[in-house]
Amino acid sequence: MTQALYLISAAQLRAARALLGLDQRALAERAGLSHPTVQRMEASDGVIRGNIDSLGKLVFALESAGIELLGDGATSSGLGRGVRMKERGAAKADTDSTLLLRR
């Protein structure tokens, strides 16, 4: 398992599950976890804190299904398309330039 085990956020979990087209029950089943456990993880604020064994099972299930979890500043080795959050300053600059283009 990867370092993402300790860094996965609730937002990453929800996005990964959406990319796979799974509902919470299906992900729980694949990971060998209970549905309430996955619900609690997704309802977390920020980085998921919980039982290391449960987090490990979850990350393993996601990675086995083809998900690549990226931490801050990480680069992707994948060839497919992806989505990630911009740095907060970069998002503001993009918004400002978009507003200028619309005038």
Task: Kindly label every feature range from the protein language model.
Residues L33-G50:
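Recognition helix of helix-turn-helix/homeodomain-like DNA-binding domains
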Residues M1-A18:
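A short, Lys/Arg-rich alpha-helix, primarily the initiator
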Residues A16, R30, M41:
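Residues in the recognition helix of alpha-helical DNA-binding motifs
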